[in-house]
Every structure is written in structure tokens, then in C-alpha cells.
Amino acid sequence: MIRKEKPDLIITQSPRRRYDRIFASHPDHLAVGEATLSAVYPDSQNPHAFPHLLDEGHDAHTVKAVWIAADEFPDTFVDITDVFDQKFEALFKHTSQISN
């Protein structure tokens, strides 16, 4: 997917377990973070990894930035005041996590 879409930025979950914020340590979130970071580096920029992708026209690609959500040491904060209602509307669609 990275070689096909060639993103400049990828946003993912942290692969690190957080004991102070247990929701951030859900096994699925940790697995997604690890899989994403492994896909970004070194695989997406290594032309020798998955050589069949070269045959399909998907050249190696270096992602310029990776933002990691729920990390222990956040360094970027986004003001969502203007989209707060949309944020909660989207969150409530995640019915496996929020049932009421």
C-alpha cells in the first residue's frame, strides 16, 4: 500500500505498551503500530524487499514523517474544537468499543 499510494505522512498507533493509559495498550493497537512501523521502515524503502512489487511498477518509497498516536511522549497536539462534534460522531460508530 505504501509503495502504491506513496504517502508523505503516515499516522499510526504506538507499538509500545502504556501502563498509565490501558486503552492505548489494547493488543490490536499494539499490533497495528508494530505492523505499520515495520512496513514503513525498512520495507517500503528497500527495493530488495518484496521484489515482485517492482515488477508491478511499485518502486521503493521513503515516507517523510510518521506520527504516532497515544505515544508516551507526545510532541504534537491538534486543536479539534471546530470538529469536536464530528469526532464524537465518528467515535460512536465504533460500536465494538462504545455500546451506549
Question: Where is each model-derived feature located?
Answer:
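Metal-dependent de-N-acetylase/amidase catalytic core
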Residues: M1-N100
